[in-house]
Amino acid sequence: MALDPAKQKAIDMALAQIEKQFGKGSIMRLGEQMSRLNVEVIPTGSVALDVALGVGGLPRGRITEIYGPESSGKTTVALHVIAEAQKMGGVAAFVDAEHALDPVYAQALGVDIDNLLVSQPDTGEQALEITETLVRSGAVDVVVVDSVAALVPKAEIEGEMGDSFVGLQARLMSQALRKLTGAISKSKAVVIFINQIREKVGVMFGNPETTPGGRALKFYSSVRLEVRKTETLKSGQEVVGSRTRVKVVKNKVAPPFKQAEFDILYGQGISKEGSLIDIGTELNPPVIVKSGAWYSYGDLRIGQGKDNARDWLRQHPEVAAEIEQKIKERLNVASLPVKYADEEAGDADV
């Protein structure tokens, strides 16, 4: 629709004044550059989770919260995102507020620990200041904060053990996120906050679980992932890993409430080969054919039982890469097979 020439001239002058005062790109027409509407992502290292997210990974320029019970795989998922970013030539930082990062495990997951920036801050304020500085540099692609529960305000650290500091951490997070959100959007960084789970006292109905740090992170996060261990994986009598379910509780860049399941193997992290087998057999027609206990790819019989098929793919990375490429070529991310989780009323309260 053509605007009145006088009105168009007034708008152009206003846009020019805004750009002169605040910089180029501070205001634009939404459809001016279609490329801006495409969501840039960093893969998670799990094909199944990339599918559930709907866009192929975690969106750049956005905040992601990963939460769940202890030892459910939260840090493992975050470390895989770091590894994927580094493979793409990106720079990653890990703000270790829990002082619990294991460099040997990180390296086993594919993280280049020689080039990983690590900080172990003393206070919550220090951790969030470091995060802001890294984001504003514009040179860091992924920043992981582990964890929100460990971001202890300076006043609490300097106070006595029995002192009460109600709402102090929530106010700290709220203030920090107000400052961070604009900088994150401009820098195109993926900022991941790992969080724990607490239980609200006296809840009779609904979900009693909540996450520490107040409500601000829930609002500012574009993606929220709930990570839970569903079963233990065994090889004979030996425990070798766990089956993990990740539910996309909130998603501002694609439809939410999808879920992904994958194997986390001890000492190896997310089994990419296992995810390929899961998705490859679910496609119609399947990329990987399951006949009885045997798995086949084309004319190749890749193993009897999932464990053997997974080991075979690990030993033949060129075939695994070919299968992954076929899956990506066959279907767009949005149309890949995903399982929808039940939309429970209690999810909004976590």
UniProtKB/Swiss-Prot annotation:
GO terms for cellular component: cytosol. ATP binds at G68, P69, E70, S71, S72, G73, K74, T75. Pfam families: RecA (PF00154), RecA_C (PF21096). Keywords: ATP-binding, Cytoplasm, DNA damage, DNA recombination, DNA repair, DNA-binding, Nucleotide-binding, SOS response. It is found in: Cytoplasm. GO terms for molecular function: ATP binding; ATP hydrolysis activity; ATP-dependent DNA damage sensor activity; damaged DNA binding; single-stranded DNA binding. GO terms for biological process: DNA recombination; DNA repair; SOS response. InterPro entries: AAA+_ATPase, DNA_recomb/repair_RecA, DNA_recomb/repair_RecA_CS, P-loop_NTPase, RecA-like_C, RecA-like_N, RecA_ATP-bd, RecA_C_sf. Gene3D superfamilies: P-loop containing nucleotide triphosphate hydrolases. Belongs to the RecA family. This is Protein RecA.
